[in-house]
């Protein structure tokens, strides 16, 4: 097929040079033999010297999108328009213009458990809305959009196991967010060496001293609001923010030397292979209530096993559809079970190796983006 693809290659803008979606959405399409014309949002921003998602970006990108698509469509008609866009990226009018040219349109989205509001406006204009979280179909139908379940996966030609000795007992790659600090603290307090890589585990550079003072000022503000707010709900909310702030501040001392700034994509892949155990967390804050957490699957559930890493994360029924619990991926229900299983598999290396290998076989055999795309195109009768 001839496919027009547009996306931002990064899955996390706080990680300089991240090309996560380039590796997972673009490269597998090429690998399958499709002809792909790629329009990268980061390159559009660079070309016009504007900030991605700044005030000018949406209008500029919409113009570039229509111009590029029309130009390439004139050269040779497309079989599919495929995008990873949200409401902040593109004007609805641009999508309508492309739709008028008669090319099937598909948009991919994820994080819809807590960020569905980001795609509510544009979704009805696509023929197919590919969602990674299984239950997002209900939300999409409610706004008149056509849902197609397109689960997360990983590209085995990028997430390649590396040989060598283990560098870390336990590692976590991701931001200090939601209940992650709580779980990490529980492990550290019980003597587990945990290395964390990602945003907010350390005070971000540059201007660390200034940012530290700003955070302390915010803490005082939260404390006053927790003490004097007339709303019990607000008092609870700001008390919780102070608790997590103090917990992380204390962890930076008790776990000194094991918190790290965000790492590159290549470093991340290496960490997955060189950690005895990789931790993941499915929990995110609720879209409507920041005091409540919900669960959804991430790329990590497929990246780590693809790198032949031993992976432990929260139990979920949806995850159990992809991996057999405690035989291909280790799953926990609470902090006590997490600690118990981490201790067990650090001590029982043969058992750990069996799960590591089984998880790799399942990921590489069933959960590749090459297989996801092949199944998707067969389902949509696109070849």
Residue ranges: model-predicted function:
Residues 1-52, 85, 90-93, 128-319:
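Nucleotide-sugar donor-binding catalytic core of glycosyltransferases
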Residues 347-378:
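A charged, aromatic-enriched C-terminal amphipathic alpha-helix characteristic of glycosyltransferases
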Residues 74, 121-122, 271:
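Structural alpha-helical scaffold elements that stabilize or flank donor/cofactor-binding regions
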Residues 72-88:
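Short N-terminal targeting/anchoring amphipathic segment
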Residues 97-112, 130:
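Active-site proximal beta-strand in glycosyltransferases
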Residues 118-129:
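A conserved, positively charged/aromatic
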Residues 329-335, 345-349:
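Conserved acidic donor-binding segment of nucleotide-sugar-dependent glycosyltransferases
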């Amino acid at each position: 097929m001839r496919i027009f693809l547009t996306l931002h290659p990064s899955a996390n803008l706080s990680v300089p040079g991240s090309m996560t979606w380039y590796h997972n959405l673009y490269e597998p399409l090429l690998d399958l033999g499709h002809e792909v014309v790629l329009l990268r949002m980061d390159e559009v921003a660079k070309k016009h010297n504007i900030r991605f998602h700044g005030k000018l970006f949406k209008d500029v990108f919409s113009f570039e999108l229509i111009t590029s698509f029309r130009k390439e469509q004139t050269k040779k008609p497309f079989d599919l328009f495929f995008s990873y866009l949200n409401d902040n990226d593109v004007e609805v009018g641009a999508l309508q213009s492309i739709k008028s040219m008669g090319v099937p349109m598909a948009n991919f989205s994820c994080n819809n458990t807590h960020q569905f509001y980001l795609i509510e406006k544009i979704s009805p204009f696509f023929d197919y809305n590919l969602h990674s979280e299984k239950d997002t179909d209900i939300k999409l139908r409610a706004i008149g959009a056509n849902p197609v379940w397109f689960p997360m996966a990983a590209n085995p030609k990028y997430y390649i196991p590396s040989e060598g000795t283990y560098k870390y007992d336990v590692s976590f790659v991701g931001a200090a967010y939601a209940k992650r600090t709580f779980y990490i603290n529980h492990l550290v307090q019980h003597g587990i060496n945990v290395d964390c890589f990602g945003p907010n585990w350390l005070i971000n550079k540059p201007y660390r001293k200034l940012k530290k003072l700003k955070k302390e000022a915010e803490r005082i503000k939260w404390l006053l609001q927790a003490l004097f707010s007339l709303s019990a709900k607000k008092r609870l909310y700001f008390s919780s923010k102070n608790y997590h702030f103090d917990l992380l501040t204390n962890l930076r001392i008790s776990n000194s030397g094991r918190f790290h700034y965000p790492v590159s994509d290549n470093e991340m892949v290496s960490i997955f292979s060189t950690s005895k155990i990789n931790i993941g967390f499915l929990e995110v804050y609720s879209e409507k209530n920041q005091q409540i957490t919900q669960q959804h699957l991430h790329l990590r559930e497929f990246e780590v096993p693809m790198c032949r890493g031993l992976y432990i994360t929260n139990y979920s029924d949806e995850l159990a559809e992809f991996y057999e619990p405690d035989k291909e991926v280790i799953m926990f229900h609470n902090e006590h079970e997490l600690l118990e299983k981490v201790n067990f598999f650090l001590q029982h290396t043969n058992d750990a190796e069996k799960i590591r290998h089984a998880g790799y076989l399942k990921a590489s055999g069933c959960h590749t983006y090459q297989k996801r795309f092949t199944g998707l195109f067969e389902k949509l009768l696109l070849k």
